[in-house]
Amino acid sequence: MRKDLRIGALLATLAAIALVGLLIVMLPGAGPRATYGAKTGEIDERFAQGVLMLHAKQYEHALTAFHRVLALDPAMPEAHVNAGFALLGMGEAAAARDFFAAALELRTRQLNAYYGLAVASEQLGDLAAARGAMRTYAHLAPRDDPFRRKAEAALWEWDPGISKK
């Protein structure tokens, strides 16, 4: 009767995989992963601070936090959007519009970027762009979105074919 070697081979394979994994982790180049984790932690912390400052209407502080987030991760559309809303709060509609547009270049379905782009465009007197961005927002937003009714009201208000008496 032959001895079944499959179990021994399986255990030897698993041990070899574990050993190779351990060696990879211990390589000199493994340090950046720890740095990436620290970087991610700072991004999360700064983003949360920015959101808190945004809600507290401390727009300058919020913008500073979002600028730091973008320095660490320039491809984060949420940070672009929130920087845009901070700039709107500071009365800087043109700069805000640029941040909303950058967010949409990174992620075309970033809904709050369309909303912010519409508000910024309206403040700049570009009602055609405001209507376009708000229509996109209203089209993509779920029915239960808390800002959808505001978007529909803005579209009604901005409609050039409706007489507002």
Predicted regions and their residues:
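Terminal, low-structured helical/coil segments at or just beyond the last alpha-helical repeat
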Residues: K3-L11, L19-T35, R131-K165
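Alpha-helical segment of the N-proximal tetratricopeptide repeat
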Residues: Y36-L72
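Structural signature of tandem alpha-helical TPR/SEL1-like repeats
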Residues: H55-R68, G89-A102, L124-T136, R148, ...
